[in-house]
C-alpha cells in the first residue's frame, strides 16, 4: 500500500532535510480505522530528522507524537480528498500560524489529476472491515459509524 511504502521510506531513512512526508489512505475509510503513526514519527526522530522534516497524513497521531506532524487531514485520500492528488516532487507550503497547507499547482493541473484519480482498490470485499469502511464518516465528525452520528451535534459528556 502507499502508506506502507511511505512508512518504510521513513524507517529506511530515504528522505532528506526539508522534505514533507505524505502518508495517505490511512483515514477512517482508507485504513480503515485510522492507524497510529507513532512508528513513523519515532523513526523520523530516531534518525535525527524530527526537527528537519514535516509529516502530513489523513491518519492519526497519539499524544506521544513530536515534531511538525499534521494529522486527521480531510477529506481523506480514499474519498478523493486533495491529499490523494499529491505526487513526489510537489511543492507544499505549510503556514502553522495561519493554519494553512497549500500545494503549488495550478487549478488546471489539480483538475487534471482529479479526473485521473480512482479510488484505491481495497483488499477485502466483505466482513467487518468492509462494513466499517462503507459506513464510517469523516474524522472531523469523530468517524461515526451510524447515519445519525454524522449529523449529531449534542455532546453527552460533562466537560
Language model features with spans:
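Phosphate/diphosphate-binding loops
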Residues: 43, 48-61, 65-105
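Intein/HINT protein-splicing elements and their conserved insertion hotspots or analogous self-processing inserts
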Residues: 80-81, 85-159
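Alpha-helix N-cap/helix-initiation motif
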Residues: 33-34, 46
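Glycine-rich phosphate/diphosphate-binding loops and the adjacent beta-loop-alpha structural elements
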Residues: 22-33
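Charged helix-capping and loop-helix junction motifs
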Residues: 36-42
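Single conserved hydrophobic/aromatic residue that forms the stacking wall/gate
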Residues: 1-11
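Glycine-rich phosphate/diphosphate-binding loops that line cofactor/substrate pockets in enzymes
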Residues: 12-20
Amino acid at each position: 500500500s502507499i502508506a506502507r511504502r511511505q512508512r518504510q521510506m521513513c524507517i529506511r531513512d530515504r528522505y532528506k532535510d526539508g522534505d514533507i512526508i505524505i502518508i495517505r489512505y490511512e483515514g477512517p475509510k482508507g485504513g480503515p480505522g485510522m492507524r497510529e503513526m507513532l512508528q513513523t514519527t519515532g523513526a523520523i526522530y530516531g534518525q535525527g530528522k524530527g526537527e528537519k522534516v514535516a509529516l502530513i497524513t489523513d491518519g492519526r497521531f497519539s499524544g506521544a507524537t513530536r515534531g511538525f506532524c499534521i494529522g486527521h487531514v480531510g477529506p481523506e485520500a480514499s474519498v478523493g480528498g486533495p491529499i490523494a492528488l499529491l505526487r513526489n516532487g510537489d511543492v507544499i507550503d505549510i503556514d502553522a500560524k495561519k493554519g494553512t497547507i497549500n500545494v503549488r499547482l495550478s487549478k488546471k493541473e489539480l483538475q487534471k489529476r482529479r479526473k485521473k484519480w480512482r479510488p484505491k482498490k481495497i483488499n477485502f470485499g466483505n466482513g467487518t472491515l468492509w462494513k466499517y469502511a462503507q459506513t464510517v464518516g469523516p474524522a472531523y465528525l469523530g468517524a461515526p459509524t451510524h447515519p445519525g452520528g454524522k449529523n449529531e451535534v449534542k455532546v453527552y459528556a460533562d466537560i
